[in-house]
């Protein structure tokens, strides 16, 4: 009987000891403020939700709501390299909305992937990547593109936002 209890205890210890309960990480990056090399960790759903809320506000052209998800000191870099602060970005978005409306055009996009990764889960801040497909259409035709927005999210707000675009060449057969 003692032998069976000992084997049961030993099996249970082996089972629990063999489970990896550590924080999984992968890859490497020296993209940090201290210059150290870190591994990537999975981010949180909270940071992903910030990106989803930014998208909802942009889709609805609700720039008052958008302010809730961007820090007052946010740095935004468009795909053409132009940099914006919060106020100049919203001013530019209002101009773009006006141009789209005056041309009776449509500007649509939808995301296909959102994920968050973190270099150091013990310090705040997560890198969120959002992949989009977009389309602008007016009386002259349409333009389509793929886009990646990269956000750095801290305390529920985007601190910086970079956009990268790839035009899609539509060919007719």
PLM features: what roles do these ranges have?
Residues 54, 65-67, 74, 89-92, ...:
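Hydrophobic pocket/interface hotspot
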Residues 70, 80, 132-134, 165:
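A mature extracytoplasmic/lumenal domain signature
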Residues 90-139:
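Surface-exposed, charged secondary-structure patches
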Residues 19-64, 68:
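Short, low-complexity N-terminal intrinsically disordered segments enriched in polar/charged residues
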């Amino acid at each position: 009987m003692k032998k069976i209890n000992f084997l049961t205890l030993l099996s249970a210890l082996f089972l629990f000891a063999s489970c990896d309960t550590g924080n999984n990480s992968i890859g490497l990056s020296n993209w940090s403020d201290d210059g150290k090399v870190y591994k990537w960790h999975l981010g949180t759903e909270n940071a992903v939700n910030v990106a989803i809320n930014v998208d909802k506000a942009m889709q609805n052209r609700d720039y008052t709501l958008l302010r809730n998800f961007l820090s007052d000191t946010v740095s935004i870099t468009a795909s053409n390299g132009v940099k914006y602060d919060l106020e100049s970005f919203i001013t530019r978005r209002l101009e773009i909305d006006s141009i789209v409306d005056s041309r009776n055009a449509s500007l649509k996009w939808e995301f296909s992937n959102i994920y968050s990764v973190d270099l150091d889960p013990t310090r705040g801040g997560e890198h969120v990547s959002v992949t989009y497909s977009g389309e602008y259409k007016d009386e002259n035709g349409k333009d389509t593109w793929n886009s990646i927005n990269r956000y750095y999210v801290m305390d529920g707000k985007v601190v910086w936002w970079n956009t990268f675009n790839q035009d899609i060449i539509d060919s007719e057969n």
